[in-house]
Amino acid sequence: MLELKNIRFDVQEGSQEIEIIRDVSFTIPDNKFVVITGPNGGGKSTLARLIAGIEKPCGGAIVLDGEDITEKSITDRARMGISYAMQQPVRFKGIQVLDLLRLAAGKRVSVADACQYLSKVGLCAKDYINREVNASLSGGELKRIEIATVLARGTKLSVFDEPEAGIDLWSFQNLIQVFEQMRDSIKDSSILIISHQERILEIADEIIVVADGMIDRMGPRDEILPSLIGTTSAVGACIPMGGKPLSVPASDGSAVPGNKKGGEA
């Protein structure tokens, strides 16, 4: 279980301190598929980086299974079972997919096991196992290979920052199928996705809406999703693939624009 307790994060812009995250608290229980959504610039991606250890909070605590990990590095958190998938996966010239899966797992992975991980994410193993992770791969292929590395790692908490970014509609549909399979087979772990996409929100167990650096609302999907879809309360973000963000009223009825803080997600 992951807990964020009164998390605060500021950045310095010239002589000013800008609040990005303001006193945010929430819990991600075990065996849950959680999606964080909200307007562009609301602080969603910053929260993902804070959880992964890429950024350190200015206040508050991050607790994993009862242990305070606030000061732990990204490497320490990875060893403890937190994985982080970036919006744009890195290409590794000269490294084959099999090697990448073994590096991710931190141990010797058999070819048979590697093929199984690739098959789970919808890739034909024999076509990819010996391919280089380079520019010859499409964005959708890279995303699925990155998810395969998360499966190989066997983490307690898998964090995906806008996995739909930079991929086409066909790849996005395949990606949804992969996440549905991960949700259905989830055991002794949790999945956290930062996303604007309605199709991803539809498969969540819990939804957390973040706006202007704060929790606007959170709860079970069936309680939160109806207020986000098909109306101007679509959080500037809950949109079909290829759609445009909307302006959003917050839970108190005030308007939340679809873009804030210069594009910070």
Regions found by a protein language model. Name each.
Residues Q88, G94-S110:
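Q-loop/switch helix immediately C-terminal to the Walker
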Residues G60-E67, D113:
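Conserved ABC transporter NBD signature motif
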Residues T37-P39:
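The feature captures the beta-strand-to-loop junction immediately N-terminal to the Walker
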Residues E162-P163, W170:
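Walker B catalytic motif
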Residues M214-I239:
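Conserved beta-strand-loop-alpha-helix hinge in the C-terminal portion
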Residues A52:
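Helix-to-loop junction immediately C-terminal to a conserved catalytic motif
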Residues D68-S83:
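ABC ATPase NBD coupling module
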Residues L2, E19-I21:
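Conserved structural motif at the start of ABC-family nucleotide-binding domains
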